[in-house]
Swiss-Prot record:
GO molecular function: acetylcholine receptor binding; acetylcholine receptor inhibitor activity; acetylcholine receptor regulator activity; ion channel inhibitor activity
Role summary: Acts in different tissues through interaction to nicotinic acetylcholine receptors (nAChRs). The proposed role as modulator of nAChR activity seems to be dependent on the nAChR subtype and stoichiometry, and to involve an effect on nAChR trafficking and its cell surface expression, and on single channel properties of the nAChR inserted in the plasma membrane. Modulates functional properties of nicotinic acetylcholine receptors (nAChRs) to prevent excessive excitation, and hence neurodegeneration.
Name the record gives this protein: Ly-6/neurotoxin-like protein 1
Range of residues in the leader sequence: 1-20
Propiece residues: 93-116
A GO cellular-component term linked to this record: endoplasmic reticulum
Assembly and binders: Interacts with nAChRs containing alpha-4:beta-2 (CHRNA4:CHRNB2) and alpha-7 (CHRNA7) subunits. Interacts with CHRNA4 probably in the endoplasmic reticulum prior to nAChR pentameric assembly. Interacts with KCNA2/Potassium voltage-gated channel subfamily A member 2.
Covalent lipid sites (GPI-anchor amidated asparagine): N92
């Protein structure tokens, strides 16, 4: 083997192989859900969506997605919703950060006001 070919093979062997992302995938009426799964190869993000029907009733959905569109509130439905994405194994296991929940307080109050 030529020295150049040997060098190329050594460099290629040192490169990390692309691995599928592991995400929690579930839908749960409550605070959180955990169900680790291996995502398809073309998936780049783990996504968590929380839909608030009332301040005390929500649905949590977690999935593998190829693209991410993070939202705080879509503005068209009567339910408040948050979506967050991340890009490392099982990163969507924890709940959304407290500041995001606090940011939803005015939306939740407006939703409640509209229901009355």
């Amino acid at each position: 083997m030529t020295p150049l070919l040997t060098l190329i093979l050594v460099v290629l062997m040192g490169l990390p192989l692309a691995q599928a992302l592991d995400c929690h995938v579930c839908a749960y009426n409550g605070d959180n859900c955990f169900n680790p799964m291996r995502c398809p190869a073309m998936v780049a993000y783990c996504m968590t969506t929380r839909t608030y029907y009332t301040p005390t009733r929500m649905k949590v959905s977690k999935s593998c997605v190829p693209r991410c569109f993070e939202t705080v509130y879509d503005g068209y439905s009567k339910h408040a919703s948050t979506t967050s994405c991340c890009q490392y194994d099982l990163c969507n296991g924890a709940g959304l950060a407290t500041p995001a929940t606090l940011a939803l307080a005015p939306i939740l109050l407006a939703t409640l006001w509209g229901l009355l």
